[in-house]
Amino acid sequence: MTMIFPKGFMFGTATAAYQIEGAVAEGGRTPSIWDTFSHTGHTLNGDTGDVADDFYHRWEDDLKLLRDLGVNAYRFSIGIPRVIPTPDGKPNQEGLDFYSRIVDRLLEYGIAPIVTLYHWDLPQYMASGDGREGGWLERETAYRIADYAGIVAKCLGDRVHTYTTLNEPWCSAHLSYGGTEHAPGLGAGPLAFRAAHHLNLAHGLMCEAVRAEAGAKPGLSVTLNLQICRGDADAVHRVDLIGNRVFLDPMLRGRYPDELFSITKGICDWGFVCDGDLDLIHQPIDVLGLNYYSTNLVKMSDRPQFPQSTEASTAPGASDVDWLPTAGPHTEMGWNIDPDALYETLVRLNDNYPGMPLVVTENGMACPDKVEVGTDGVKMVHDNDRIDYLRRHLEAVYRAIEEGTDVRGYFAWSLMDNFEWAFGYSKRFGLTYVDYESQERVKKDSFDWYRRFIADHSAR
């Protein structure tokens, strides 16, 4: 297949602040909920982001990797506790200056800065220790995060190409409050919907704040990790309502699906939705981001729905849905590889929400990467499986574009190996290998492959 992507198509890669920066007690930064979560035994091997990739001290060299890669965009997040370290909401100029330098260097390299405003590192002072109070369970959090977004937008202004309000709010609600996998790990099932609504509200308020401070030039976006399922149509529809349309519909249509209310009425009264909220949430955005890695296989079970269940669940309201093993091959995360589903999802989003440009904001593969040393002493990482994964998913994106879907960009996850949340440092997604002891960087074969792909398949 001869693929030439449209002129202006963004080829990029992505990272997140807590996963790479380290320096958690430097530059005025204070703890986030992930500092607390990782330091209290909730991650593999007790790993934390205390040092991570030490990007805070090595950012200049790491941005040179982007220049070498030949990308025209870089998606990164602002560490909220580095910018707003105290409950009084006063900005920390040292933190703002750090991100301002990054933006300026990217522009110097001809790389568009794509800024994620919230990538899970909620300041600990906004939440109680166990997560049962504060955080995204409280309406006030949405307003405080919007204030922070305005501070960032005032500082970075229209130097930023696109401001993304939220990264994967499904994780921030369903994994963090419904389940126990992510900070704060509350495990209270239906409270995921309360958190989801406040995240939706924050999205709308952040959009308003960014426009007020940065003007109309920068784009506005939100990034969702949709729960893409195959199998029983009724089960697929149920998961779609609970995990996808709970965000998509209020953001893009200004309403929650009536069916969502009906299937959750036994576990959630939705009384936290106030008059005027949906108007605030339903803000015009310029692009919808999609993080895509794999699919699920589901079917309706024979057991009845448990309408009063308040147990830990990442899919509250779907206790009568069975999650089945998926066919291989699988990545190191245990996720199946299904590039056709990326194509199908892009087309479906284009059909269901017409006129909304799309960007694949994350896509990548965890592999069991090993460093080899050649006879000339040069270190290498041969990751052919990752190359095949990236190639097949880029082909899926191109197929969607050729059939009329408006896809504006693709971001490989990730620029370099990093702290993989609850999995600690056990999973490697990077195009660049990181030795966490020495902090040495080694470009993997996939780095060079992606560089060549961008050069060969970009419109001149």
From Swiss-Prot:
The active site is at 168 (proton donor), 362 (nucleophile). SUPFAM superfamilies: (Trans)glycosidases (SSF51445). Optimum pH is 5.5 with pNP-beta-D-glucoside as a substrate. Retains more than 90% of its activity between pH 5.0 and 7.0. Retains 70% of its activity at pH 4.5 and 8.5. GO terms for molecular function: beta-D-fucosidase activity; beta-glucosidase activity. InterPro entries: Glyco_hydro_1 (IPR001360), Glyco_hydro_1_AS (IPR018120), Glyco_hydro_1_beta-glucosidase (IPR017736), Glyco_hydro_1_N_CS (IPR033132), Glycoside_hydrolase_SF (IPR017853). Bifunctional beta-D-glucosidase/beta-D-fucosidase. Activity towards pNP-beta-D-fucoside is about 80-85% of the activity towards pNP-beta-D-glucoside. Also has slight activity (less than 10%) towards pNP-beta-D-galactoside, and very low activity (less than 1%) towards pNP-beta-D-xyloside. Hydrolyzes laminaribiose, sophorose, cellobiose and gentobiose. Not active against maltose, pNP-alpha-D-glucoside or pNP-beta-L-fucoside. Monomer. This is Bifunctional beta-D-glucosidase/beta-D-fucosidase. It comes from Bifidobacterium breve.
